Amino acid sequence: MQTTVNKSNMLFCDYYKQWISVYKEGAIRPVTMNKYNMAHNWLIKLIPDLIISDLDRITYQKLLNDYAAEHERQTTMDFHHHLKCAILDAVDEGLILHDPTRKAIIKGKPYNGSVVKTKI
């Protein structure tokens, strides 16, 4: 078993990927796993260089806002929930001093109502 000596200097996107591997692989359905992996891909796109110990409320809110610029509110809420689980564990581990997800404002594009229905 390999552990990181100084996790506080770890990139948040790397911590999140490791967290998925440890806590989610083999415990959730493949469709749900895909959602966690998509969240990881968005972290790489939006905050590739963010050190985990630098994640604060303002940085987290900016991350959500950037994600919300391209997604509907419910999708942004799902993204937030996927990240929050890992972030709360990082707080418990002492890697982040305070919960940056506290009082987060969830934004997003309005629901466009375009649901694709197929006939059986």
Regions found by a protein language model. Name each.
Residues 61-65, 92-120:
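Flexible interdomain linker/hinge and immediately adjacent N-terminus
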Residues 11-15, 99-102:
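Secondary-structure junction/capping motif
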Residues 1-4, 103:
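Short, structured interface segments
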Residues 4-5, 119:
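N-terminal compositionally biased, intrinsically disordered segments and leader/signal-like regions
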